[in-house]
């Protein structure tokens, strides 16, 4: 079994390094300057405040924020956003309603702030840049009539609430690991001493738990401060791979390959200090709690390291401190129960504690896979997920042998995990890119569309305005209709339409007599801006019909994402009207 875990862990590490209809509602997309109203302001503290007022129905991508001209160590810490999922780019962090950032005092000169966003209705704007003078000159203003917390602050508060609950639960689980639960009675005796009343015992245990949680909170604050500028680097595939490899390394101790703990010299020194502390007093209990936060056992080291790594990526010191404080409180809850009501409410030690360690191990491997998703081919990523589920299924089946009456639970879990893992592996072999519908790639409807290669070959890709003009002149000379498809690699809706509209055989058959030009505006350069500006297109996806006379049928223009039926209906209307 260990060999199987080790093989999969090495495999991940190796890979790491290596339905709305806009025509019915006629959405009126805002210009980029109104969808994302940007302001910068020099504060009395010397900091420079950047603020985006984001219109309803629009969102900014976290990973598209750029600060050209500003040293990496001075980049503002990016708050947690809202998770936005799509079929092609996976989970992305986005900001809605408002975003507020601060550049630390001391930064000088002019910088270029880049950002990019999309509309929920299916339009993606090209990258946009604003020049900000860090010397205090306010170039861009907007009316921020706000009397309470900004929308961005409210979003952060909601995300923080969930994080507190998750980390409290994580701490509660860590309290039941083999290194922690059997030690609780001994620990209670050290803290409380003999003859203490339940009320006194609760006060002493609370002093211990709060002190321990404060040490964890300090670790969280330090990790966030050290990683405050990490977000700008996390778009690097090598760095993502390195972090994924670290999580794989943290998973191995959970499966018993080795023990990860503090160096012996440090551990012995802390233990000596701990033994010299006397229980029975609030101060002594508090000191013991603080030392226990530093004296991390082998079952705690890997989960704590993983939590600190997660916090370092967020770069938010307050957030990091609070969630690790919540984790510390969760770890201390069983101790509080023990000193007040006895051990009748606590589970008895047993083989289930080793099972809990294994669960943490699988969570670490899953985290490694999630970190790798942006840099892996989607079908390869789905295949790796399937492999992890199959190993989890085998593990659950093996564990069922030692749990008697609840063995059927492990058997059912093994069956479910095995079936899902097998489906993912089969789907990945066929090129599936859908985690929840892995076999859809083999369906008849998808096969018919996938078998039609004309969706890519029929389009002529244009990146230069002069090349566009030549194609238009030639089409007009031949009396041919032209379809201009504004496209970009970063446009999610473009990917959807490429697959669900132009990937359909009957759609391409209807366009057989039309000259198909794909205007690629992926790059943020003068050529892309000129292509967008020629017909005043806000961004991709946008579809324009140019008649045989060389004139655009403006009333039939398509802006945003549509399905195949709507597209064909619009083309039929355009063609029959002229």
Swiss-Prot record:
Taxonomy, superkingdom: Bacteria
Entries under NCBIfam families matching the protein: PRK00293.1
EC class of the enzyme, as a word: oxidoreductase
HAMAP family assigned to the protein according to its UniProt record, in alphabetical order: DbsD (MF_00399)
Periplasmic side: 19-158, 229-237, 303-321, 373, 430-578
Example GO biological process: cytochrome complex assembly
Catalytic activity: [protein]-dithiol + NAD(+) = [protein]-disulfide + NADH + H(+); [protein]-dithiol + NADP(+) = [protein]-disulfide + NADPH + H(+)
Function according to Swiss-Prot or TrEMBL: Required to facilitate the formation of correct disulfide bonds in some periplasmic proteins and for the assembly of the periplasmic c-type cytochromes. Acts by transferring electrons from cytoplasmic thioredoxin to the periplasm. This transfer involves a cascade of disulfide bond formation and reduction steps.
Domain Thioredoxin span(s) in chain numbering: 433-576
EC number: 1.8.1.8
InterPro entries: Cyt_c_assmbl_TM_dom (IPR003834), DsbD_gamma (IPR035671), DsbDN (IPR028250), DsbDN_sf (IPR036929), Thiol_diS_interchange_DbsD (IPR022910), Thioredoxin-like_sf (IPR036249), Thioredoxin_CS (IPR017937), Thioredoxin_domain (IPR013766)
Record's signal peptide: 1-18
S-S bridge residues: 118-124, 179-299, 491-494
Cytoplasmic topological domain residue ranges: 180-207, 259-281, 343-351, 395-408
Keywords, sorted A to Z: Cell inner membrane, Cell membrane, Cytochrome c-type biogenesis, Disulfide bond, Electron transport, Membrane, NAD, Oxidoreductase, Redox-active center, Signal, Transmembrane, Transmembrane helix, Transport
Localization in the cell: Cell inner membrane
Protein name: Thiol:disulfide interchange protein DsbD
Sample GO molecular function, one term: protein-disulfide reductase [NAD(P)H] activity
Pfam families associated with the record: DsbD_N, DsbD_TM, Thioredoxin_7
PROSITE patterns per record: THIOREDOXIN_1 (PS00194), THIOREDOXIN_2 (PS51352)
Main location: membrane
Membrane-spanning residues: 159-179, 208-228, 238-258, 282-302, 322-342, 352-372, 374-394, 409-429
Matches recorded under SUPFAM superfamilies: Thiol:disulfide interchange protein DsbD, N-terminal domain (DsbD-alpha), Thioredoxin-like
Annotated membrane topology: Multi-pass membrane protein
Sequence similarity: Belongs to the thioredoxin family. DsbD subfamily.
């Amino acid at each position: 079994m260990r060999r199987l875990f080790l093989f999969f862990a090495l495999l991940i590490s190796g890979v790491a390094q290596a339905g709305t209809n806009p025509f019915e509602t006629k959405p009126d997309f805002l210009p980029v300057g109104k969808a994302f109203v940007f302001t910068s302001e020099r504060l009395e503290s010397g900091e420079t405040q950047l603020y985006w007022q984001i219109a309803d129905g629009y969102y900014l991508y976290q990973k598209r924020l750029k600060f050209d001209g500003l040293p990496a160590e001075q980049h503002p810490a990016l708050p947690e956003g809202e998770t936005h999922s799509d079929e092609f780019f996976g989970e992305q962090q986005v900001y809605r309603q408002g975003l507020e950032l601060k550049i630390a005092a001391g930064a000088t000169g002019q910088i270029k702030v880049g950002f990019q966003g999309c509309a929920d209705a299916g339009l993606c704007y090209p990258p946009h840049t604003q020049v900000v003078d860090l010397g205090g000159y306010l170039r861009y203003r907007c009316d921020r009539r706000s009397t309470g917390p900004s929308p961005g602050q409210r979003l952060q508060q909601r995300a923080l609430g969930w994080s507190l609950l998750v980390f409290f639960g994580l701490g509660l689980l860590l309290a039941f690991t083999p290194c922690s639960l059997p030690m609780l009675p001994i620990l209670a005796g050290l803290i409380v001493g003999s003859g203490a009343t339940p009320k006194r015992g609760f006060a002493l245990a609370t002093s211990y738990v709060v002190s321990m949680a404060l040490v964890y909170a300090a670790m969280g604050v330090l990790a966030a401060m050290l990683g405050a500028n990490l977000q700008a680097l996390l778009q690097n595939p090598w760095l993502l791979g390195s972090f994924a490899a670290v999580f794989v390394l943290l998973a191995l101790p959970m499966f018993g390959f080795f023990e990860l703990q503090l160096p012996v010299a440090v551990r012995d020194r802390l233990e000596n200090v701990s033994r010299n502390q006397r229980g029975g007093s609030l101060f002594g209990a508090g000191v013991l709690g603080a030392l226990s936060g530093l004296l991390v056992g082998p079952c705690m080291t890997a989960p704590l390291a993983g939590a600190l790594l997660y916090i370092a990526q967020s770069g938010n010191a307050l957030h990091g401190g609070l969630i690790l404080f919540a984790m510390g409180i969760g770890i201390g809850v069983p101790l509080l129960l023990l000193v007040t009501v006895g051990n009748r409410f606590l589970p008895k030690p047993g083989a289930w504690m080793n099972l809990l360690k294994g669960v943490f191990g699988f969570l670490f491997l899953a985290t490694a896979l999630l970190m790798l998703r942006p840099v892996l081919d989607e079908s390869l990523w789905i295949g790796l997920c399937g492999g992890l589920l199959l190993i989890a299924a085998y593990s659950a089946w093996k564990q069922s042998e030692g749990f008697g009456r609840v063995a059927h639970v492990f058997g059912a879990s093994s069956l479910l995990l095995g079936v899902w893992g097998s489906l993912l592996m089969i789907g990945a072999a066929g090129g599936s890119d859908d985690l929840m519908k892995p076999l859809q790639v083999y369906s008849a409807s998808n096969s018919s569309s996938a078998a039609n290669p004309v969706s890519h070959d029929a389009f002529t890709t244009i990146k230069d305005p002069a090349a566009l003009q030549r194609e238009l002149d030639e089409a007009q000379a031949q009396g041919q209709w032209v379809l201009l498809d504004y496209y970009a690699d970063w446009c999610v809706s473009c990917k959807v339409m490429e697959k669900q509209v132009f990937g359909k055989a009957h759609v391409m058959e209807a366009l057989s007599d039309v000259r198909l030009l794909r205007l690629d505006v992926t790059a943020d350069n003068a050529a892309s801006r000129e292509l967008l500006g020629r017909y005043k297109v806000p961004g991709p996806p946008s579809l324009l019909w140019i008649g045989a006379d060389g004139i655009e049928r403006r009333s039939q223009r398509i802006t945003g994402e549509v399905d195949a039926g709507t597209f064909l209906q619009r083309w039929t209307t355009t063609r029959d009207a002229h």
